[in-house]
From Swiss-Prot:
Organism from which the protein derives: Lymnaea stagnalis
Pathway in which this enzyme or protein is active: Carbohydrate degradation; glycolysis; D-glyceraldehyde 3-phosphate and glycerone phosphate from D-glucose: step 4/4
Single biological process term from Gene Ontology: glycolytic process
EC class: lyase
Family of the protein in this entry: Belongs to the class I fructose-bisphosphate aldolase family.
Active site, renumbered: K11
A molecular function GO annotation: fructose-bisphosphate aldolase activity
Enzyme Commission number, as recorded: 4.1.2.13
InterPro entries in the cross-refs: Aldolase_I_AS, Aldolase_TIM, FBA_I
The entry's keywords: Glycolysis, Lyase, Schiff base
Protein name, per record: Fructose-bisphosphate aldolase
Recorded catalytic activity of this chain's protein: beta-D-fructose 1,6-bisphosphate = D-glyceraldehyde 3-phosphate + dihydroxyacetone phosphate
Length: 101
């Protein structure tokens, strides 16, 4: 398809268990599954990976991204985040819609 991979940023979710899954996986489990999936599918030429929070809390998304970055496996792309709601939720809750200055 004549894609310029070196100019491409990929915005995936992390590999996490579904909402109905009763087992709680560790950040290390999530890191292993995520890095494995990326290595199997994403060309090394891709310019970078910017993770979405995928419905995780701000704390879980941050802990899991740290585990992914610390994971010793091959990661030929820069890894960062593109969180929206995960970083806004606690701020919006604290604000609560009040019109104070």
């Amino acid at each position: 398809h004549n894609m310029f991979l070196e100019g491409t940023l990929l915005k995936p979710n992390m590999v996490t268990a579904g909402q109905g899954c009763p087992k709680k996986y560790t950040p290390e489990d999530i890191a292993r599954a995520t890095v494995t999936a990326l290595n199997r599918t994403v060309p090394a030429a891709v310019a970078g990976i910017t993770f979405l929070s995928g419905g995780q809390s701000e704390e879980d998304a941050t802990i899991n991204l740290n585990a992914i970055n610390q994971f010793p496996g091959r990661k030929p792309w820069p890894l960062t985040f593109s969180y929206g709601r995960a970083l806004q939720a606690s701020v919006l809750k604290a604000w609560g819609g009040k019109d104070e200055l």
